[in-house]
Regions:
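Terminal amphipathic alpha-helical/low-complexity segments used for targeting or macromolecular assembly
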Residues: 1-147, 289, 294, 300, ...
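Short, flexible loop segments at the rims of nucleotide/cofactor-binding pockets, characterized by
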Residues: 13-16, 179, 196, 262
Length: 310
């Protein structure tokens, strides 16, 4: 995945934090860090690091010529395969000059394996898998903000984090592990299962959302079904729309990438909807489809191999 100013490390959020910020915060719990070196293309990453870690120096390098030699405790964002570091290896790293990770990566600690895990985020389904893992690993109890409003008729089942300003209407069911970001609204009779919903996500009446990620500031009308999908920021979904997530033959879902169909390795995968898209009423998005940012899909469309967008 190429480095860019709006890469997943800066555009995606985990528990309300940009991915790159959460990565550094996690690494800092185990490593002494006083400098972070990022590719020149990742301009947003520099801004985020400076805002959140003013005491950490930030440098940039040309990704075509990465020769950083210094004596500081450094995170250098380069590229390699996924791996884990056990406690002994973490102690060893603290004595080294540099610690290199891909810019589009996810760093998290596994209590079960007693290791710092570093997973590259290459494909959308990689991110969905990691979101499910981080929900399970990080949400062990239900934490509800005193500033949240939950109807007495609604059910919170399993561990959930419900942030400030969240409103959950009557007869809803929230099944954990689930995270609901600040200022979000869940409409009457909706079912939310194993999801991460960014801030100011608005879910309408009688919707089902399962194993999905919403970037935030998204709005859904009534009776929608979103399954195993990644929804970008500022998306509008009209009523009676949804993402199909399984093929009738139950084979692995294939995803179009650069004109080629890539086997996802999984048989449950919905759609990837880019930022600021508008999806009309009664639209069905077939499994493994990508809706580019700023697209408009007219009402009644079946969004499949022959894409119909404006």
């Amino acid at each position: 995945m190429a480095d860019c100013s709006d890469c997943p490390a800066t555009s995606l959020k985990v528990f309300g934090q940009p991915l790159i910020v959460r990565n550094i915060q996690t690494a800092k719990e185990f490593l002494d860090i006083d400098k972070v070196v990022v590719p020149k293309e990742s301009t947003n990453a520099v801004k985020l690091i400076e805002e959140n870690f003013p005491y950490i120096d930030v440098e940039q390098f040309s990704s075509s010529n990465n020769n950083n030699n210094n004596d500081s405790r450094t995170i250098t964002t380069t590229a390699f395969h996924n791996y884990l570091l056990n406690s002994n290896e973490v102690r060893t790293l603290n004595k080294k000059a540099e610690f290199e990770v891909p810019v589009n990566t996810f760093i998290h600690y596994s209590l079960e394996r007693a290791a710092l895990l570093i997973d590259a985020v290459i494909y959308p389904w990689d991110f969905l898998k990691l979101i499910q893992k981080v929900l399970c690993d990080n949400i062990k109890d239900t934490i509800i903000s005193p500033n949240a409003s939950i109807a007495k008729s609604s059910i919170i089942e399993g561990p959930c984090i419900i942030e400030d300003g969240v409103t959950i209407d009557d007869f809803c069911k929230i099944k954990g592990p689930t995270y609901i970001g600040k200022g979000s609204f869940i409409g009457m009779s909706s079912l939310i299962r194993n999801c991460m919903l960014g801030e100011k996500t608005r879910i309408g009446f009688n919707c089902e959302i399962a194993r999905s990620y919403f970037a935030g500031h998204d709005k859904m009308a009534h009776q929608n079904v979103i399954l195993d999908s990644v929804i970008g920021k500022g998306v509008w979904l009209g009523g009676y729309s949804g993402t199909a997530n399984v093929l009738l033959n139950n084979q692995n879902i294939r995803y179009e990438l650069n004109g080629q169909l890539v086997d996802t390795g999984i048989n449950h995968f919905g759609a990837v909807i880019g930022n600021n898209c508008s999806v009309g009423a009664s639209v069905i998005i077939l499994p493994g489809r990508q809706v580019p940012s700023n697209s408009i899909i007219q009402a009644g469309t079946i969004f499949g191999k022959k894409k119909v967008i404006s």
